[in-house]
Amino acid sequence: MRPRPEGRGLRAGVALSPALLLLLLLPPPPTLLGRLWAAGTPSPSAPGARQDGALGAGRVKRGWVWNQFFVVEEYTGTEPLYVGKIHSDSDEGDGAIKYTISGEGAGTIFLIDELTGDIHAMERLDREQKTFYTLRAQARDRATNRLLEPESEFIIKVQDINDSEPRFLHGPYIGSVAELSPTGTSVMQVMASDADDPTYGSSARLVYSVLDGEHHFTVDPKTGVIRTAVPDLDRESQERYEVVIQATDMAGQLGGLSGSTTVTIVVTDVNDNPPRFPQKMYQFSIQESAPIGTAVGRVKAEDSDVGENTDMTYHLKDESSSGGDVFKVTTDSDTQEAIIVVQKRLDFESQPVHTVILEALNKFVDPRFADLGTFRDQAIVRVAVTDVDEPPEFRPPSGLLEVQEDAQVGSLVGVVTARDPDAANRPVRYAIDRESDLDQIFDIDADTGAIVTGKGLDRETAGWHNITVLAMEADNHAQLSRASLRIRILDVNDNPPELATPYEAAVCEDAKPGQLIQTISVVDRDEPQGGHRFYFRLVPEAPSNPHFSLLDIQDNTAAVHTQHVGFNRQEQDVFFLPILVVDSGPPTLSSTGTLTIRICGCDSSGTIQSCNTTAFVMAASLSPGALIALLVCVLILVVLVLLILTLRRHHKSHLSSDEDEDMRDNVIKYNDEGGGEQDTEAYDMSALRSLYDFGELKGGDGGGSAGGGAGGGSGGGAGSPPQAHLPSERHSLPQGPPSPEPDFSVFRDFISRKVALADGDLSVPPYDAFQTYAFEGADSPAASLSSLHSGSSGSEQDFAYLSSWGPRFRPLAALYAGHRGDDEAQAS
């Protein structure tokens, strides 16, 4: 290589395109120029530019000198775009140095000429995708591939041009504004963005404008805020507006790019419209028999507003003479309709037509729009009442009548009146509902409605009568109405007064004069209007009583006192004092009652000790409750007794059935040779089912045996005691609990042994059956009367031994003795 003159350094050439040259001729921004100059001026601290102290301050060592490269985006030429040139000051131009680059886009986007160091852009660049590329440059010896200069980093910046139009990124836009809003009311804000470099030129400076809808809305050029342009937006006229907003870059200058968006603006409702009835008069009809609560009809006022601004209420103003309470109106919350309802009975005859004024008004009124007028409207509603065939009407519908209880049958009680309310005014017929007058105490004239007595009356039995009177049309009995009548029976003095109770009093023998014995009161079933007043005196037949006196206390009671000192009950122990009671009438009635006074023996303190032979019983009475309680107790006792008897009978029948079922298991052992007093005793079933402790049977055990006779066993001689030679069978029964199952083997063994003994006994007659028995308890002194062991003739028998058996066998002995005498007489 040729020696390089000192003071030379790395140079980098930049090929400027016409557009870039134009930009450089313009005054560049101070920051960019400073950056370029700083990059183009070697610095002691920059890579590849260091200062050598041996050569002095003005001597610089060989190295890289390079500028920042620029390339314009969106190049449309057919040839590669020249970017710039890198060069080492050691390059002599002989091709010994090879230039290479590495980094972003090296070899693809950017290519370098190895000999000259020229860099070209091979692709179309877009600054909006990538604003700069960072690469590294190397200078190598072509022969040895040795680095001649340290590797240096440089940047290729993509120069922006206005190639991106503004874009609205947040659409679609929907805004709203209330109707009748003032001019300049903010609706919403729209914003666009531009991908161009905002720091270079005016490519990203945007301005906003209205392309469509400028008559109603405006937009701020800088902020994009949309506002109303007029104060009279009316939702009822137009509810939705489509406004086109445009954004232009280059600050709106000629040649700038633009983008647009459509903004939907909805006009919201306010309550600026009053309700309006579609017509000024409505007509309805309803039958006069319609019950209260029946809907007459529906009316709806229209409101151009929406939502809650259409909520309304209705009121009725009645202009008819019937007043304002015949109908009422309610509002259907779902349909906002007025429902006219009947709230009083209708009557075609009294008023066939009703005219009311229906008023509708908004429920919510906005005071901002009060100057627009009253938010209410009115309409006339006419309701025609149609006639129906109605039943007669009682006037009055109920009443009270009075009659004396001594009124004769057929006496007039009162008159009821009913009339047909219809225009035809048909005749009315009357009757009494017999369900309310089962005893037919009253009758009524079918034509006049006059009520008379049908039977005799008694106030004391029934003081009031409630009857139902029927009225019906003469030619249509289905049209029927009812009226309730209360008939009060007026009292007359027809019952004499009576003593309140059968009075009995007791007085001591040593009573003093003037001693109070009894206070008398009276009852009277009558109820005079002025109240009761009773008078007491002794009967005229005995006006003066030497023993007792009667004092009228003037309060409907009287007192009985003693007249003298002491009584002798031995002479007279009971006094009967007749008392006359008279009422005040009219007419005055009286009755006589008797006060029974008993003379009794008393102690020193006046306590009664005895009242002769007749017991003194104080008058007492039981209340209905006490009587009922007493009857209930008696019934309970009767039921308990019947229940006990039923249970006992059921228990007996149960035992009887059990005995019948077990009859086949009974073994009855008896002795019929005596007087018979022990024959009815049988063993208990539980004992028979238990195991007998028979022990070892001996040859002489088992008693006598006989075949087919009434009793078995050997008979003794005529004069010997009965069965003296027979050993008795006595077996003890086990005392433990009975065996759950009967052991029949014991009985088989016992019977088998008895049969074997009978077979071996030559004295036993040849019968197929035999009986065996044993004794239990005390022996009977009576011997056997069986003829099994007797002689061949009755004459050979001697019954003299019967007389030795005791007094119980004397009739039997006399019987056999007489029989013997007859036999002897026949024999002689």
UniProtKB/Swiss-Prot annotation:
For region Disordered, the annotated ranges are: 702-745
Glycosylation site list: N162, N466, N612
What topology in the membrane does the UniProt record assign? Answer: Single-pass type I membrane protein
BP GO annotations: adherens junction organization; calcium-dependent cell-cell adhesion via plasma membrane cell adhesion molecules; cell migration; cell morphogenesis; cell-cell adhesion mediated by cadherin; cell-cell junction assembly; homophilic cell adhesion via plasma membrane adhesion molecules
Record-linked InterPro entries: Cadherin, Cadherin-like_dom, Cadherin-like_sf, Cadherin_CS, Cadherin_Y-type_LIR, Catenin-bd_sf
Pfam families found in the cross-reference section: CADH_Y-type_LIR, Cadherin
In its UniProt record, a GO molecular function of this protein is: cadherin binding
- Those parts of the protein on the Cytoplasmic side are 646-828
All residue ranges annotated as the Cadherin domain in the record: 64-168, 169-277, 278-394, 395-498, 499-616
Main location per UniProt? membrane
Q: Which residue spans traverse the membrane? A: 625-645
Keyword Calcium belongs to the record: yes
Q: Which sequence ranges form a coiled-coil region, renumbered to this chain?
A: none
Where is this protein localized, as stated in its record? Cell membrane
Give the compositionally biased regions (Gly residues). Answer: 702-719
Keyword list (alphabetical) reads: Calcium, Cell adhesion, Cell membrane, Glycoprotein, Membrane, Metal-binding, Repeat, Signal, Transmembrane, Transmembrane helix
Q: Which terms in the GO cellular component ontology are assigned?
A: adherens junction; catenin complex
Q: List the stretches on the Extracellular face of the membrane.
A: 36-624
User: How far does the signal peptide extend, from start to end residue?
Assistant: 1-34
The UniProt function text for this chain reads: Cadherins are calcium-dependent cell adhesion proteins. They preferentially interact with themselves in a homophilic manner in connecting cells; cadherins may thus contribute to the sorting of heterogeneous cell types. PB-cadherins may have a role in the morphological organization of pituitary gland and brain tissues.
* Record's comment describing the protein's domains: Three calcium ions are usually bound at the interface of each cadherin domain and rigidify the connections, imparting a strong curvature to the full-length ectodomain.
Name of the protein this chain belongs to: Cadherin-22
The organism of origin for this protein: Homo sapiens
Upper classification of the source organism reads: Eukaryota, Metazoa, Chordata, Craniata, Vertebrata
